[in-house]
Amino acid sequence: MMRILLFVATNLAVVLVASITLSLFGFNGFMAANGVDLNLSSLLVFCAVFGFAGSLVSLFISKWMAKMTTGTQIISQPRTRHEQWLLQTVEELSREAGIKMPEVGIFPAYEANAFATGWNRNDALVAVSQGLLERFSPDEVRAVLAHEIGHVANGDMVTLALVQGVVNTFVMFFARIIGNFVDKVIFKNEEGQGIAYYVATIVAELILGILASMIVMWFSRRREFRADEAGAQLAGTAAMIGALQRLRVEQGLPVHMPDTMKAFGINGGLKHGLAGLLMSHPPLEDRIEALRQRG
C-alpha cells in the first residue's frame, strides 16, 4: 500500500509541475489567443484519474485474470509428489525472501514458462507451465521459481501497474492538447469540438501510446534483471544461469501465454531491432551475461 501511495503522490506532483511549467511558458495564453479555452490543471487531474483507473483495476483483478486466461489450476491439496515438491519449494523460497506464501498453480502449456502476479507482495500467485515441470530439472525449476518469487518480493507487479498509470495519464493529456490545437488553431473550429479534434486525439493517442509502451517495456526489462539477481540469491547463480540457458535452448517454441500475461512470464520470446524496444524481456543472452558478471 505504501508503494501505491508513493506513486500516486509522485504522479500528482508531476501533474502539478507540468501544469505550472506549461503556464510559465505561456502555453495557456497561446492557446487562449487562438480560441482554445483549456484548463490544464483540470485536464491533468481528469487524465490522471482515468489513466490510473485502468491500470489499478487490472492490478487488483490480476490474479483472477491470470487464472482465467491461462487456465491455471491452483494447488490447494497436492495430489502428486511433484505438486508436493512444488508447494514445499515455493514455501521455502518465500520464507527466505521474507514474503507470505503465495498461491501456487500449474497451467497447461507445452512451452517452459512461469509467471507471478497479484496486487500485493503478500497476496500473490506463482504459476508454472506443465512443460516446465516435465522437461526441466528440479534445480532449474527451483531457479525459475526463485526468479518469480523475486518479482513478488520486489513488488514488480505493483510498480509496473503504477508506471503504466503514469504514462497513461500523459498520453491522454498530451493527446487532448494536440486534438484541441488541431481543431481550434489549424481548422479554426469555433463551435465545440469538431471532427478534427476526435481524429487528431485518436491519432495522437496511438502514436504517443507506442512511445509510452517503449518506456513501460524498458522498465519491464530492467525488472527482469533484478528478478534474475533475486533468483540467483535464492537459488544460486549457477542454477539461475542454468535455467536461463535451458530456456534459450527452447526459445524457438511458440509462446501460448496470453498477451496480457507475457510481461509477467520468465520467457518473453525473442525480437531484435526496433521491435526489441517493445519487448517485456531482455534477450536471454544479456540476462545470462549479467549474472556471469555478477559472479
From Swiss-Prot:
Gene3D superfamilies registered for this protein in UniProt: Metalloproteases ('zincins'), catalytic domain
UniProt cross-references to HAMAP family, sorted A to Z: Pept_M48_protease_HtpX
Gene Ontology CC terms: plasma membrane
Entry protein name: Protease HtpX
Topology versus the membrane: Multi-pass membrane protein
PANTHER family (UniProt xref): PROTEASE HTPX
Co-factor: note: Binds 1 zinc ion per subunit.
Pfam families the record matches: Peptidase_M48
Cofactors, names only: Zn(2+)
InterPro entries registered for this protein in UniProt: HtpX_protease, Pept_M48_protease_HtpX, Peptidase_M48
Catalytic residues (positions): 148
GO molecular function, one term: metalloendopeptidase activity
Enzyme Commission number(s) of this protein: 3.4.24.-
Chain residues that bind Zn(2+): 147, 151, 224
Family affiliation: Belongs to the peptidase M48B family.
Transmembrane regions listed in the UniProt entry: 4-24, 41-61, 158-178, 199-219
Annotated compartments: Cell inner membrane
Keyword set, alphabetical order: Cell inner membrane, Cell membrane, Hydrolase, Membrane, Metal-binding, Metalloprotease, Protease, Transmembrane, Transmembrane helix, Zinc
GO terms under biological process: proteolysis
